[in-house]
Amino acid sequence: MNQFTPQPGIMDIALYQGGKAHVDGVANVIKLSSNENPLGPSPAAVEAIRATAAQAHRYPSTDHAELRAAIGAVHGLDPDRIICGVGSDEVLQFVAQAYTGPGDEVIHTEHGFSMYPILARMAGATPVQVPERQRVVDVDAILAAVNDRTRLVFLANPANPTGTMISEAEVTRLADGLPGHVLLVLDGAYAEFVEGFDGGAALVSARDNVIMTRTFSKIYGLGGLRIGWGYAPREIIDVLNRIRQPFNLSTMQLAAAEAAVRDQDWVARCRDQNTTWRTWLAARLAELGVPSDVSCANFILARFADQGEAEACDLFLQSRGLIVRRVAGYNLPQALRITVGDEAGCRAVVDAVRAFKEARA
């Protein structure tokens, strides 16, 4: 028997379950389980990756100054209030590590991103789940759950896996209603899919209790490189940088992200295609008796009659080489989360669901 005992609480942490990428016995699959951009990264980002290959023997920047400057220029933000990480997950981890510990509580919502309770437990804090209202964040429920032990509120807007979104006015009401010892963390992983939405940046600029995170994994198509960033008051950024590894991002990551964020024409193209096929996919599935809430992200949450039908449909889709995401772990056992793919992928999903429904009729 292993004589080494981990710190208390570590074995209570559930392993994160990512989207499937393979189906046994199926050679060619269409992966629609991880909310990846079907158009991939900007050609400028691809070229930046190639250009950095010959410099792999050189250590990267420790302060990410060029990437922070590019992000600041594109979004109109102060680069000194930006921190970069290995995906936005790492920035979220910095926040939990820096501001929570044993005896503290971290609020997340009923169908919120599964990393939030994991990050809380990693820091020794206690995750507190609050109910949503018809798969939409309930600000009043969050405020009612806050107490003297609360330190963080994690909020994804748009949300994953529901795709729903609350208004900027509601987010502001939440920030205004939190006591001074609580930080509001706005996870804007899908913010770019909403044209004109700043992900909460203006709220961060105006207050000292709000943090925003963003990622290059979704609309920028760089999920395989793992790059994210956060925007917060300078005092908080200073704290987070003290627990950040100095070389946490490689030269390739930094160059690709800088090229990607500067290519906003590519972002607009990806957003427009996603909007077109998200609308089409949701409408066609609704016609087949599979409704979904209005999504503001790059996926839809397709709802079936019950868990049995959802799981049966998932297996049917897999038999046709279509990989989507079961979300029972998000307290949504009767639903499947389907990434908005390209035209061929969306049409294949609708054809398969139609065949599934006809076979069960």
Curated annotation (Swiss-Prot):
- The enzyme's main class, written as a single word, is transferase
Q: Name one GO biological process term.
A: L-histidine biosynthetic process
The alphabetical list of record keywords is: Amino-acid biosynthesis, Aminotransferase, Histidine biosynthesis, Pyridoxal phosphate, Transferase
**What's the EC number here?**
2.6.1.9
- Check the UniProt entry and state the signal peptide residues, or none: none
* Catalyses which reaction(s): L-histidinol phosphate + 2-oxoglutarate = 3-(imidazol-4-yl)-2-oxopropyl phosphate + L-glutamate
Q: Which residues cross the membrane?
A: none
Cite the GO molecular-function annotations of the record.
histidinol-phosphate transaminase activity; pyridoxal phosphate binding
The UniProt entry's sequence similarity note says: Belongs to the class-II pyridoxal-phosphate-dependent aminotransferase family. Histidinol-phosphate aminotransferase subfamily.
Q: What is this protein called?
A: Histidinol-phosphate aminotransferase
In its UniProt entry, the species of origin is given as: Ruegeria pomeroyi (strain ATCC 700808 / DSM 15171 / DSS-3) (Silicibacter pomeroyi)
